[in-house]
Amino acid sequence: MAATLGPLGSWQQWRRCLSARDGSRMLLLLLLLGSGQGPQQVGAGQTFEYLKREHSLSKPYQGVGTGSSSLWNLMGNAMVMTQYIRLTPDMQSKQGALWNRVPCFLRDWELQVHFKIHGQGKKNLHGDGLAIWYTKDRMQPGPVFGNMDKFVGLGVFVDTYPNEEKQQERVFPYISAMVNNGSLSYDHERDGRPTELGGCTAIVRNLHYDTFLVIRYVKRHLTIMMDIDGKHEWRDCIEVPGVRLPRGYYFGTSSITGDLSDNHDVISLKLFELTVERTPEEEKLHRDVFLPSVDNMKLPEMTAPLPPLSGLALFLIVFFSLVFSVFAIVIGIILYNKWQEQSRKRFY
């Protein structure tokens, strides 16, 4: 279902207008603050958005590097170019990633990804795609679109090559999403079908206009939309209620090539904090969680980690363990002496 960009009343139009230029965004925000209006409302239910620059990235990519002041780190074959960050070039056996150094503690958020996938390969002779991550671990290379398998968190995959030979009902490129608590492996042979939350076809390769992906997480409701037709409108792709994601994870994006390849470029990543009104009942229901999960979807080993013991608790455990050990030894000695005394009486 398309969300047409009409007047500035719709939240989609507002976001697109603000995303055009960071300078105009800041100027507009300052004018709004100066007039006492604050950030613009972007939807029903009193929802407002704020750009979080510590979790965002755009040209000229000054926050990318290895220094202590850098907000983003590159990994593998990823390179900073003038107009984009190239995760992988159109060459075989390459992988690269871009990771935010700052953990995200936002409760409700929206990530807008401006990307481009292109290359020389003809139909079905290109790959493999890219992924957008919100995970507990960062900078961990692996086989899942350049990231580690059995990750903890959320992965959104733009898969450009079908590995499953017998699949016919699915047209690639294909966008899918997966929530993992560290117990599941991504099934490459079946293109991730056993663990996906949903997906949609997305013809995003070798296009001559901008392509965008939006990941929205509000009130434990995950929504993924795309703007890939050059019409400046969002199309729904995935919508999943009951998604529980812990706070304090990292945003990143990665890509990998094998025998087939493509250029996988990221132009910008922009994260918005969404302020959403909650009822008292929703406040109770939406408490922080320790492990990612999805309601009505059973994941193996869904056991929350025990909180670490405090110093006092550890001392008391050791102390009482020693007392119990000494007590057991004393009782053992007393019983042994009584047994020996009874044995001597029988002997005489």
Curated annotation (Swiss-Prot):
Membrane topology: Single-pass type I membrane protein
Record InterPro entries: ConA-like_dom_sf, Intracellular_Lectin-GPT, Lectin_leg
GO CC annotation: COPII-coated ER to Golgi transport vesicle; endoplasmic reticulum membrane; endoplasmic reticulum-Golgi intermediate compartment; Golgi apparatus; Golgi membrane; membrane
Disulfide-bonded cysteines: C200-C237
A Pfam family matched in the record: Lectin_leg-like
Main localization (coarse): endoplasmic reticulum
Keywords attached to this entry: Disease variant, Disulfide bond, Endoplasmic reticulum, Glycoprotein, Golgi apparatus, Intellectual disability, Lectin, Membrane, Metal-binding, Signal, Transmembrane, Transmembrane helix
GO MF annotation list: D-mannose binding; metal ion binding
UniProt note on tissues of expression: Expressed in numerous tissues. Highest expression in skeletal muscle and kidney, intermediate levels in heart, liver and placenta, low levels in brain, thymus, spleen, small intestine and lung.
Biological processes annotated in GO: endoplasmic reticulum to Golgi vesicle-mediated transport; protein folding; protein transport
Transmembrane portions of the chain: 314-336
PROSITE patterns noted in UniProt: L_LECTIN_LIKE
Localization, UniProt: Endoplasmic reticulum membrane; Golgi apparatus membrane
Disease: Intellectual developmental disorder, autosomal recessive 52: A disorder characterized by significantly below average general intellectual functioning associated with impairments in adaptive behavior and manifested during the developmental period. MRT52 clinical features include global developmental delay, severe intellectual disability with poor speech, and mild seizures in early childhood. Intellectual developmental disorder, autosomal dominant 69: An autosomal dominant disorder characterized by developmental delay and variably impaired intellectual development. Additional features may include intention tremor in infancy and seizures in childhood, with remission of these in adolescence.
Name of the protein: VIP36-like protein
Source organism of the structure: Homo sapiens (Human)
Lineage start: Eukaryota, Metazoa, Chordata, Craniata, Vertebrata
